[in-house]
Amino acid sequence: DKTICALDKVSLRTLQNCMQSVFEDGPKRDRRLWLGDLRLQALANYETFKKNDLVKRCLYLFAGQTKDNGQVSACLFTEPEFIIDDTFLLDYSMFFGATLADYYAATGDMDTLKDLSACAYRQMEIAAESFDENDLIKNGDGFWAFIDWTEGLDKQAAMQGVYVYCAKKVQEIAGILGNKEKEAELKTEVKEKTEAARNYLLDSQSGLF
């Protein structure tokens, strides 16, 4: 299909233009590295340009500059120096572990997986503090998670899903590294949070969360 091929060509050029010293948000926009964007850009890169060292660089930049509690920032600036923004989004923080797991799956880079695993574990520990007694994630105040730009959007169900997805990814990391305790802990988290989503967030009539 000519249209699909044309779209693919433009998409690849767009991705290439964003691959500078980091994966930029856009060469003509704010030119920042966003963690949520990095995850998707990296997945496309593994199938196309295979500039995997650039993904590695971005992961280390995020892990190397965190809040005092260990949470990674949602984005960082590259000029005039590398510095994190004061924007912290819970879904983006959790995506650090998922992005690391994807990077390992694409590269087999065990050294980086070992080196950054503690940061991945920490993001899930921080996120786990946001759940109530029913194992449901609590809506935060202000700009606490991204999910989508829609004004007034209730992000609870989506964030519950992000937590389960990322917990599964980080559980994979723990399993690969032989960390049985962390693997079991995350397996339990996945089970409990999935059950809570089905019990409290699922609309039985529509079949949607």
Each language-model region and where it sits:
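Substrate-binding groove/exosite segments of carbohydrate-active enzymes
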Residues: 1-129
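The feature captures the catalytic groove of carbohydrate-active enzymes
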Residues: 69-96, 105, 110, 127-209
